[in-house]
Amino acid sequence: MHNDLWQSYHPNGVPKQGEGLTRKDLTKDTIVAAAHVWLWRRSSDGGCDILLQRRADQVKNWPGYWDISAAGHVSFGETPLDAALREAQEEIGMTLDTSRVKFIGSLPKRKSAYSEFHFVYIYEYHGEPLDMVDGEAAALRWVPYDTFRQMIEQPEDVMLVPHQPLYFALLMEELGRISRES
């Protein structure tokens, strides 16, 4: 399990050397980061499916909602890629091959108590075993690209964790390119 210190960041997205923060240290002026990994697989029609995780009912944020395949905060001293690899292992029991993890971008997000950068990755799934390990996920579900595109238009209607429009635009541009490559 990762430590309770999160890596602190400068406003330009560069980590602050030697500065880790606990949840109680967070203020409106602090910036931390989260790594998001979206798993996708080639569908039978040549497009792509996206793996969603239903958050467990006992988690603090967005219980019962569908969300990113695996995600979590960047721990002190970790890189965003390290955090992505760790979270995939912790949440869905999958060891990612770093050569197949593709970084698609980072976006700032202002929260009510603090700010964070979201480092977004995609990963092509090839049938490796999946297992909801740490109790944060209650279910896993593969969703076709077109269905996911519809879900993000009305996230509350389908209990999908809402993200910024720019976030979904970044993700859907990359997944759309993959889906058209068939």
Feature-to-residue mapping (PLM):
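Acidic, metal-coordinating catalytic segment for phosphate/diphosphate chemistry
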Residues: M1-S44
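Conserved Nudix-box catalytic region and its N-terminal flanking loop in Nudix hydrolases
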Residues: L21-A34, G46-R86
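Short loop segments at secondary-structure junctions
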Residues: N12, R41-D45, A56, E124-P129, ...
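A short coil-to-beta-strand element that immediately follows conserved catalytic motifs
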Residues: T95-I104
